[in-house]
Amino acid sequence: MDKKFYITTLGCPKNIADSMSMHHSLLEEGFTLASLPEESDFHFINTCTFIQSATEETIQTILSAAQVKKQNHQKLVVVGCFAERYPDNIHSEIPEVDLFFGTGKYSQAGKILREKFPELSPSQLEFNDSLLERWKLSSKIENYSKPYAYVKVSDGCNRGCSFCIIPSFRGKFVESPLDDILRDTNRAIRAGAKEICLVSQDTVYYGRDSEILLDMVRKVAEIDSLEILRLLYLYPDKKTEKLIRLMGETSKIAPYLESPLQHVSSKILKVMNRTGESSYFKDLFSLAREVKPGLEIRTSFIIGYPGEEPEDVDQILRFIEDTRPEKVNLFSYSPQEGTKGAQLKQTVSEKEKSKRINLIRDSHLEILEEIHESRIGRTYDAIVDGIEDGQVVVRRFQDAPEMDEVVYVDDVSLIPGRIGKVRIDSFYEYDMNGTWV
């Protein structure tokens, strides 16, 4: 009997990479992918608990899935960060969950199911197709049909940012062996990916040594059939400078810098236990644009951290005005139990956090409108992601999948994965309309 699984993934691209690892493990054990959660025998929910809103979304998703389970006689499996952080709560408060496991067992998902449910004998699972053929078949369903894939280069983090709960359940930094990174990259490419996004909690920490990090990136970029290599989550430090210079030397690396600054006030950065200062960040962004023409920048800021005052917010506003990053993500600080930040006196009200976020967002939107205006009539290297509401979704190399702007075009003859050029014709607040040329 063919046993099917479905994976609901919450949170960031790192979770998507973990879901892909779980996906492959289940295929190896003979399971197949269902088109919808209600059609599955095993519904996996890969959870997120980075901030309070993510935790709330996770809980609501699990409860909704529990209702579906009652109607479809399926097993509900909760995995990842929430399961690692709150195992006792899941066990006592959500009895509908049949199985849960934490962040270190994604690649063992298939074997874990067999052990937990002995009735899943080999005779009940289909092994008629080769693993690669099953992967390609399942790639036609859900996330794996996309022309991009995420490959994790490490897990965990050693930075010790005072606002971050991740090390408490992801653990210390552990890098993936280079052979595993190359294997996962080649596997994704064989399944149809044209673009590989390297992800981790802290990509530039890889190898501890700059040359080891650069060598890893070079070797991935050297894979013949890889079209685009995108580097995500680059902590702003000296190793990132060297990585930026490599971007300028390597045509396959996308013209894109994602470096989450979290703040620019030296006072707040110190309380956050992060390094750097506004002038250094400006130099880093300038270097990136200098060595990689056409590069665009994505960064993020945490607003309302304990001790933040209006003048600290003004520093962010001035920084954005001076550096004009194309993509800015803003988080309202929420204290996480078990972090040093949660032990501090919470000095900024939720109302004030919202006010500050709106102020920064409005300021950046004015800049973004000017940036959009400058894009009109220009052509960009781009990749076709898929079709949405009858329009083809195209993404410039300057935009990361699932996070940044897209370009809508009317040419329905375009197929996912095609690479070419798109001309920008008009824009919305964030996304754009264009013509494939």
Curated annotation (Swiss-Prot):
Superkingdom of origin organism: Bacteria
Entry's cofactor comment: Binds 2 [4Fe-4S] clusters. One cluster is coordinated with 3 cysteines and an exchangeable S-adenosyl-L-methionine.
Binding site for [4Fe-4S] cluster 2: 157, 161, 164
Signal peptide residue numbers: none
UniProt EC number: 2.8.4.4
BP term (GO), one: tRNA modification
UniProt domain TRAM: residue ranges: 373-437
Descriptive protein name: Ribosomal protein uS12 methylthiotransferase RimO
Lineage: Bacteria, Pseudomonadati, Spirochaetota, Spirochaetia, Leptospirales
Gene name for this UniProt entry: rimO
